[in-house]
Amino acid sequence: MSYDALFSPIKLRGLELKNRVVLPGMNTKMVKNKHDVGEDLPAYHAARAAGGCGLNIVELVSICPECHAYLYLGLYNEHHRDELRKVTDAIHAAGGKAAVQIWHGGFVPEEFFDKTNKLETPDTLTVERIHEIVKQFGYSAKLAVEAGFDALEFHGAHTYLPHEFMNPSLNKRTDEYGNQSLENRCRFNLEVIREMRKNMPEDMPLLMRLDAIDEMLPAVTTVDETVEFIGWAQEAGLDAIDLSRGNARSLATVYEVPPYNLEPGFNMDNIAAIKKRVNIPVIGVGRIVDPALADQLIREGKIDMVAVGRAQLADPEWCNKSMEGREAEIRRCIGCTEGCYDKVIDPKATHITCTRNPALCLEYKGLPKAETAKNVMVIGAGIGGLMAAEYLKARGHNPTVYEATNAPGGHFVLAGKAPKKQAFTDAVMWDAEECKRMGIEIKTGVTVTPELIKEVKPDHVIVATGAHFVKPNIPGLDTAADVFVAEDVLAGKAMPHGETIILGGGGVGCETAQFLIEHGVTDVRVMDTKRVGNKMGMLRTMFLDIEYPGETIKKSRGSKVTAVGDHEITYAFTNKAKKTVEKTRHFDSLVIATGMHSRPTQDLTDACSELGIPCDVIGSARKADMGIEATAEAYAAAMKV
């Protein structure tokens, strides 16, 4: 299928872009010590530019020391300019065009992102300081031009400083920048646009990121007001608008990095409502992962260009594969947000990652070819085993995958049974097809034993046998009636009824609760010794409250079940007086979702040790954990063979 609209050229002021695909600015955490660019950030952008992207927008840069968060690079001195030149040079060498997102975080200062989690109340800006900030935006624009960027983007969304001025509930000023009128609320942003424009060549385009809809705040900027502002901004020198959604002060955060809970294109109706009323190119943002949808939106006139963000994290060749009719070969984003968001807010993570692309942010290392092709036995055809085989084959090795069951897929097939998670099943089935396309044999219905390892005599073994559900050791559980395992519920082998209690508030427990609600079970309670939603990731946990508000799914945190009787549990918790108390609760059905344990692997590793065969145990076979850990370990194991 051809995508003529998506891959047609477009001109922004004096800049001609080869197609309508934009890599939006996304936090990668690849900045070194707040001030330096290493090998990784240029290579990351070069991979997407070489992959066919029309415009790469480099993640946001801070305009001044006061707003310089440790996650981001600054752009307020010549050293920053010279460091960013490494990125623009890499993008240009790969055949792309480069823009940069220029930013002031406003109420989100350094302390918000400090690893100590220390927060301080920000000061009210004086008018003099506002004028200084406007000038600092202009100076950053000047430095960006000198760094070789082809376009600039002014970040005005997501409750950062420009949005704070625009929003009537966040703007509490009473002066000429205050919320007494739309003109006042827009004054700062228009001054910034004019100042940036003064420091840019006449033929260089200036973009601005805005929210297509302002929401979940005490008061909001209306669509009419946004449209009026865009007209004023265009007169001030703006050339295109990049319409996003979400803010950092409410549950609307979920729209900034949309997980699988949101349908692809979820923001497009909001964007289209603005586009039909403005006379300026519009970039659409909203979980676009399919080239057919992107092309359709442009053909229908809802957008002029499309931001393809997480989809290009998952596959940097997204554009080339789409243009060349190889859509089936695209490694698709599944919307888990485990690597692209949870790693951003994890102070231990050095950069973002991706469940579908464990080589993300490691592009600078390349894919080293094997000096000697080795025969590798991969045990387990789940997400980790299949991905290990793919990387091994790509490096020139000869992997063979062995799977004990009759079909590949592992727990990702089961994960896809939960509401809105079909992409997980699709992903692991894609990996199985990719293995076949690459000529990798998958032997199903074969249980690998020490004897088989001795018979095959591989050069290397990777054990990816995964984990299995285990019932907890609770008195009375084994003899109680109407007790189910979450795995059987999601697989459709069992259906609880009536008042249902789910033991375990991790991802499996919460998704089982969602599954039951979708299948007509109306009284569902999730209980956990910690918090409900642990290990689900921040955004997906937030969606529990959005999609299942109030008591739709009841939640009991800090509750430890100590006994199971006849349709009754006994549980202990700490009350407000800090005393441990016990209570009982009736159930009609009890579902066990307390987690998984790694399958035994010692017989396999011992056999390898005796035979002198190098062996790696990866993913849940090593430690029952998330899919993102399995694919990261698969990549690492494949790279060392």
Language model segments and positions:
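Short beta-alpha connecting loops at secondary-structure transitions
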Residues: 254-260, 304-305, 413-420, 618-623
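Flanking helices and flexible, charged tails adjoining ferredoxin-like Fe-S electron-transfer domains
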Residues: 193, 363-371, 381, 387, ...
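Short gly/pro/ser/thr-enriched loop/turn and capping motifs at secondary-structure boundaries
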Residues: 249, 312-315, 407-409, 491, ...
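Rossmann-like dinucleotide/flavin-binding elements
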Residues: 373-402, 443-457, 464-538, 574-589, ...
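Flavin-dependent oxidoreductase catalytic cores
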Residues: 1-379, 383, 391-394, 399, ...
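Hydrophobic alpha-helical segments typical of transmembrane helices
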Residues: 44, 192, 270, 293, ...
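Rossmann-like dinucleotide-binding cores of NAD(P)H-dependent redox enzymes
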Residues: 401-437, 513-561
